[in-house]
Swiss-Prot record:
Record carries keyword Translocase: no
CDD domains: CMPK
Family that this chain belongs to: Belongs to the cytidylate kinase family. Type 2 subfamily.
Location, primary (coarse class): cytoplasm
Subcellular location: Cytoplasm
Claim: Cell cycle is one of the keywords in the record: no
GO molecular function, one term: CMP kinase activity
Enzyme Commission code: 2.7.4.25
CC per GO annotation: cytoplasm
The name this protein goes by in its record: Cytidylate kinase
Length: 180
């Protein structure tokens, strides 16, 4: 079973991916975690590292190449990243999930996780980060991140908590592959 989980910052992709990976005993690879780790190692904020990635395509291209290799080579995997669904487009039998939430909800969640600035500052950072990423995705791959048509499931994490989302996704997954 191969599953991709994508969404904008603060939408809950990492949380839901971890729950799915635990429930189905799947390996979880999170490109967002990799990106954040590299930013920390370079002692840069996500916005600074994103700006650097805008100027140096090799950063995104290396991470994305790795995603394509991973989704092709693993049978039991959850790949969590903004572009995971796009990276798996040509791989058969991959369930592609997009998790969405309104910007203010996502900013509040990011603040709970990072606790570094005010709401307005984080709102500005998040909008800047999303613009940076959208520009890079369009420039590198001609991907419009707002086009959700490639996803099998789009779910709103403002309406349901992570456990309710897990329950919804279990019904969808089990109907496709049968219960594990």
């Amino acid at each position: 079973m191969r599953i991709t989980v994508s969404g904008l910052p603060g939408s809950g992709t990492t949380t839901v991916s971890k729950l799915l990976a635990e429930y189905y005993e799947l390996e979880l690879i999170s490109s967002g975690e990799i990106f954040r780790r590299i930013a920390r190692e370079k002692e840069m904020s996500l916005a600074e590292f994103g700006a650097m990635a805008e100027k140096d395509p090799s950063i995104d291209l290396a991470i994305d190449k790795n995603q394509r290799e991973v989704i092709h080579s693993h049978e039991k995997l959850i790949l969590e990243s903004r572009l995971a669904g796009h990276m798996a487009k040509e791989v058969p039998n991959v369930l592609k999930i997009w998790i969405k939430a309104p910007l203010p909800v996502r900013v509040k969640r990011i603040l709970r996780r990072e606790k570094s600035v005010s709401f307005d500052e984080e709102l500005e950072r998040t909008v800047e980060r999303e613009k940076s990423e959208a520009l890079r995705y369009m420039n590198y791959y001609n991907i419009d991140i707002d086009d959700l048509s490639i996803y099998d499931i789009v779910i709103d994490s403002e309406k349901w908590n992570q456990y309710q989302i897990l329950d919804i996704l279990k019904v969808a997954i089990d109907s496709l592959v049968g219960p594990e």
